[in-house]
Every structure is written in structure tokens, then in C-alpha cells.
Amino acid sequence: MEVNKVRIHDLPEEDRPRERLIRSGPESLSNAELLGIVLRTGSKEENVISLCSRILAEYNIKQLSLANVSRLTQVHGVGKAKAAQIAAVFELARRLETFVEEPKRKICSPKDVYALMYPRMREQKKEKFITLYLDTKNQILKEEVVSIGSLNASIVHPREVFKSALLESSASVIMVHNHPSGDPSPSREDIMVTEKLVEGGKLLGIDILDHIIIGDGRYVSLKDEGFVR
């Protein structure tokens, strides 16, 4: 069988481009192999690596990035679907060049948490418990809904709160939940949950900075109330 007709699937696993990328990283592959992973299949006449080698013999990387679908389909074996895949990859690369990451929101006080969360929580009909995961500069890395419904210690378990904290390499956590009644005064259950999570954070070396309860146009900081120490 001719080499260019050997299906990629029939190659030894250690020689397949996708498996090599997973094992050794994308930098270990040739341009034709990388493009082959994108296109996935060749034609009846040749395998995908042979097809990609022909494409790259006709267009260098720069030229390929600028070729539109109409031009790409002039290459034998490249239909509209494959041409669209190539165009999409290079368009993503162009967008990466101009991408500017939005600055992370920094939390300096309970008032900052209230300003951020109140517009989204004021009309909630059920209690929603949310955690904000922060970096060492108190910038928000991630926001996550932990539970919906009446807050109690059996629902809000430290495992659920700190799992994401560890995955995000968070330095600290701020907890937020709402009181649909409009009164942000902490209940006995609120205090118990807070104390349980503070102790869990100490064991893992993750600071619980505060637990903010949001009511109707006002809030309570359990740190200010002395329950977060």
C-alpha cells in the first residue's frame, strides 16, 4: 500500500499525530501534522497528512492564513468544509493577536461586594449562596453558585466551597448569599455555616475574608459582626 494512502488510524498509536500531541505537546508536530489534526480526514486518494503536505507545498503558513474559502477549494481534495476549518483556525489566531483581557474586579471592602452582587440578587425568590474566589491581590478569579434554597450546614459543605478554591489556586474566598425577605440580619444557621467554613479554610490555608448577606437595599458583613475571624 502506498504511504500516502495509509490511514492515520492504521498507524501505530505512538505515530499518530493526535496521540503525539497529547503525549509530547503541539511543538513536537510538523505543520502538516498540526493541520491534519484540524482537518481530521483526507480523501479516498490520500490520507490527511499527505493532503496537508500538498496544501502547504502550495501555500506557506502566511499565505494559508490569508487564503479565503474560494481560493482554498481550488486545492484538489479541499472542499468547502475543509476550507472553512482552515479559515476558522487562522481567524482565531488573528483574534488572539488583538485580544485584550479585561481587568479583574478587585474587592477592597464589603461595600464592593454589595455593589457587585446586589443588582443580580435583589429580586431572587430563593436564597442563593455564591462564593467569590480571589487571588493574592483580592481580584476575583471566579464566581460560583454553590447552592440555591434555604441555607444550612448540610447543603453548604466545605468540600464544595474549597474544591474550586484549590482548582483556581485562590488565596481567599468571600461568601455571599441573599435573604429574599429583605432583612439581611444573620440567622443562627447563617452563623453556623460561616463558622464551619472559616474553620475549613484554616485547615487548607485559604482565608475566608467575609460572608456578606444581601437584603433589600442593605447588607450585613459577618466579618464586621465578628463572626469571621
Swiss-Prot record:
Keywords assigned: Hydrolase, Metal-binding, Metalloprotease, Protease, Zinc
Keyword match Amino-acid biosynthesis: no
Entry keyword Electron transport: no
Record InterPro entries: MPN, RadC_JAB, UPF0758, UPF0758_CS, UPF0758_N
PANTHER family, per the entry: DNA REPAIR PROTEIN RADC (PTHR30471), UPF0758 PROTEIN YEES-RELATED (PTHR30471:SF3)
Family statement: Belongs to the UPF0758 family.
Name of the molecule in the record: UPF0758 protein MA_1979
Species: Methanosarcina acetivorans (strain ATCC 35395 / DSM 2834 / JCM 12185 / C2A)
